[in-house]
Curated annotation (Swiss-Prot):
Domain of life, per lineage: Bacteria
Low complexity: bias regions: 162-174
Coiled coil: 70-161
Leader peptide range in chain numbering: 1-23
Key words, A-Z: Coiled coil, Signal
Region (Disordered): 67-221
Protein name: Uncharacterized protein YscB
Basic and acidic residues bias: start-end ranges: 68-150, 195-205
Residue spans of biased composition, Polar residues class: 152-161, 175-184
Organism per entry: Bacillus subtilis (strain 168)
Length: 221
């Protein structure tokens, strides 16, 4: 509202000045007197001081330019929104790729761990089987050695028994072999030993003959 008053006063002063220049000197004096009478000098100066300079560079935008500006701003906002959405989508894709890589690495680690565990168990089982085979071989060898030792002792006893119980030594090696291979079926004659000793010798001979297959257990005396 103040601006309108200032503009009205400004145009009034301009019109007043123009009218004064087009009249005669008498009219000028009369108009000056009238203006002075209507507007006192002090009041006029006071009003002039209140006036502010009006810029002549005022910009007037047309409705079309305004609409174009709004449309451009809207397009720019949409562009920024799309850029932000694309950045967000790219960030989500990157996080998904990273998660997939981590899951793949974890699966590979578990597979390698399971393979190593299976290999360890297979190796342990193989070592256990080798140990069982070794122990079985040792036991078999020990059993064979024990059997050989027992047979050797039995043969030595059979060899020593006739020579120690016989009154006369055998005249030849063939007689010794015959004595060893043919067990006595009856008690020997009295050769200076007691009955118990001769019976034991007889039983040993029969047992040896059964083991060697010379005497049938059912026919043993």
């Amino acid at each position: 509202m103040n601006k309108l008053i200032q503009l009205a006063l400004f145009f009034t002063l301009m019109l007043t000045g123009c009218s004064n220049s087009s009249t005669s000197s008498e009219s000028k004096v009369e108009t000056t007197v009238k203006t002075t009478a209507a507007f006192p000098q002090k009041e006029l100066e006071k009003e002039l001081k209140k006036l502010k300079p009006v810029s002549l560079d005022m910009k007037f935008e047309s409705p079309l330019a305004t609409e174009l500006g709004k449309r451009k701003a809207k397009e720019e906002a949409e562009k920024q929104r799309q850029i932000a959405a694309e950045k967000k989508l790219e960030k989500e894709r990157e996080a998904k790729r990273k998660k997939q890589q981590e899951e793949k690495a974890e699966r590979q680690r578990l597979a390698e761990q399971q393979a190593a565990e299976r290999q360890r168990l297979a190796e342990a089982e193989r070592q256990a089987e080798l140990e069982r085979q070794r122990q079985a071989a040792i036991q078999k060898e020990q059993k064979a050695n024990a059997e050989k030792k027992r047979q050797s002792q039995a043969q030595r006893q059979q060899t020593e028994a006739p020579s120690s119980n016989s009154q006369d030594p055998p005249s030849s090696s063939s007689q010794t072999d015959k004595t060893i291979q043919q067990p006595a079926s009856e008690l020997p004659d009295d050769d200076g030993y007691g009955y118990e000793e001769r019976k034991k010798w007889h039983d040993d001979q029969v047992e040896w003959g059964i083991k060697q297959g010379y005497i049938d257990p059912e026919d043993a005396p």
